[in-house]
Amino acid sequence: MNTSARLLALVSKSKNNWILQQGDTKLFKSFRFKNFIEAWGFMSCVALRAQQLNHHPEWTNVYNKVDITLTTHDTKGLTEKDLKLAEFIDTLAKDN
């Protein structure tokens, strides 16, 4: 699947979709977990993958809620790195 098709798939899911923001230069998604421990565990897994990809999210955590924004600052837009990390995050979230 090409980059455009993958981006469309990420933002067009009927439930819990990623939202394009700031002129389609950022992806945003909010996640909720049973408690803080599950949220933190999720963030830890994402952090390990982000380090492997050398691509780090902008995120916040309040108790059981994690908000994630993805963008590539060097290009001031979305790149393959953002799509790879978003797809990993979605897969990980399904397991939680």
Curated annotation (Swiss-Prot):
Recorded superkingdom: Eukaryota
One of the GO BP terms on file: tetrahydrobiopterin biosynthetic process
GO CC terms: ascospore-type prospore; cytosol; nucleus; spore wall
Protein EC: 4.2.1.96
UniProt entry keywords in alphabetical sequence: Lyase
Gene3D superfamilies: Transcriptional coactivator/pterin dehydratase (3.30.1360.20)
Molecular function (Gene Ontology), one example: 4-alpha-hydroxytetrahydrobiopterin dehydratase activity
SUPFAM superfamilies according to UniProt: PCD-like
Catalysis: reaction(s): (4aS,6R)-4a-hydroxy-L-erythro-5,6,7,8-tetrahydrobiopterin = (6R)-L-erythro-6,7-dihydrobiopterin + H2O
Predominant subcellular localization, coarse grouping: other
Record localization: Spore wall
Family as reported in the entry's similarity comment: Belongs to the pterin-4-alpha-carbinolamine dehydratase family.
Function of the molecule: Has a role in spore wall formation.
HAMAP family: Pterin_4_alpha
Record's protein name: Pterin-4-alpha-carbinolamine dehydratase
Species in which this protein is naturally found: Schizosaccharomyces pombe (strain 972 / ATCC 24843) (Fission yeast)
Gene name for this UniProt entry: omt2
